[in-house]
């Protein structure tokens, strides 16, 4: 199995409801290690930059408004097949379709406020990690 790193966001809705610890517990219980984490309140410019690939889509303005509505947690997770493992823990993007026991089934209210984001591939994970973290901020977990 390949040890990978992936990028994760706990979105404003889940932060506001004090679900950070419960979500971190899900990550760690699944064998993912948190190698970097910080709380941020995104500016409009930061949110627009992060979600630039969606800038022509109809939901872009609402997405930027939501992601700037309160603090978020950004973290880098490391583990075996981390990208896929993290996405499985998150569940379907629409919480109404998410399997019971997944983060979105348990903590999200709607497809628009769906508690968390996870990278969809190694390439996007590398890009998203670099957007929020310098190499020096990543702390390998050797113990």
UniProtKB/Swiss-Prot annotation:
- Give the residues annotated as active site: 117
Pfam families, from UniProt?
A: NDK
Q: Which UniProt keywords apply?
A: ATP-binding, Cytoplasm, Kinase, Magnesium, Metal-binding, Nucleotide metabolism, Nucleotide-binding, Phosphoprotein, Transferase
E.C. designation(s):
2.7.4.6
Question: Which coarse location class applies to the principal site listed for this UniProt protein?
Answer: cytoplasm
What CDD domains does the annotation carry? NDPk_I
User: Which InterPro entries does the protein's record reference?
Assistant: NDK-like_dom, NDK-like_dom_sf, Nucleoside_diP_kinase, Nucleoside_diP_kinase_AS
Where would you find this protein in the cell?
Cytoplasm
The terms describing its cellular component in GO are: cytoplasm
Which SMART domains does this entry report, sorted A to Z? Answer: NDK
Q: Name one GO molecular function term.
A: ATP binding
A GO BP annotation: GTP biosynthetic process
Q: What catalytic activity does the UniProt entry give for this protein?
A: a 2'-deoxyribonucleoside 5'-diphosphate + ATP = a 2'-deoxyribonucleoside 5'-triphosphate + ADP; a ribonucleoside 5'-diphosphate + ATP = a ribonucleoside 5'-triphosphate + ADP
What are its cofactors?
Mg(2+)
Query: Its domain of life?
Result: Bacteria
Positions contributing to ATP binding: 11, 59, 87, 93, 104, 114
Q: Please explain the role this protein plays, according to its UniProt record.
A: Major role in the synthesis of nucleoside triphosphates other than ATP. The ATP gamma phosphate is transferred to the NDP beta phosphate via a ping-pong mechanism, using a phosphorylated active-site intermediate.
Instruction: Give the quaternary structure.
Output: Homotetramer.
- Give the protein name, as stated in the record: Nucleoside diphosphate kinase
**Species assigned in the record:** Shewanella sp. (strain ANA-3)
The gene behind this protein is: ndk
């Amino acid at each position: 199995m390949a040890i990978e790193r992936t990028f994760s966001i706990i979105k404003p809705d889940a932060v506001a409801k004090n679900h950070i610890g419960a979500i971190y517990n899900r990550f760690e219980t699944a064998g993912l290690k948190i190698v970097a984490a910080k709380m941020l309140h995104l500016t409009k410019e930061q949110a627009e930059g992060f979600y630039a690939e969606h800038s022509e889509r109809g939901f872009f303005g609402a997405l930027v408004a939501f992601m700037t509505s309160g603090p978020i947690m950004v973290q880098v997770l490391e583990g075996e097949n981390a990208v896929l493992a993290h996405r499985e823990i998150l569940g379907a993007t629409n919480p109404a379709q998410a399997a019971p026991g997944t983060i979105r089934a348990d903590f999200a209210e709607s497809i628009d406020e769906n508690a968390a984001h996870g990278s969809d591939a190694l390439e996007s994970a590398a890009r998203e990690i670099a957007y929020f973290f310098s190499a020096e901020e990543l702390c390998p977990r050797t113990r």
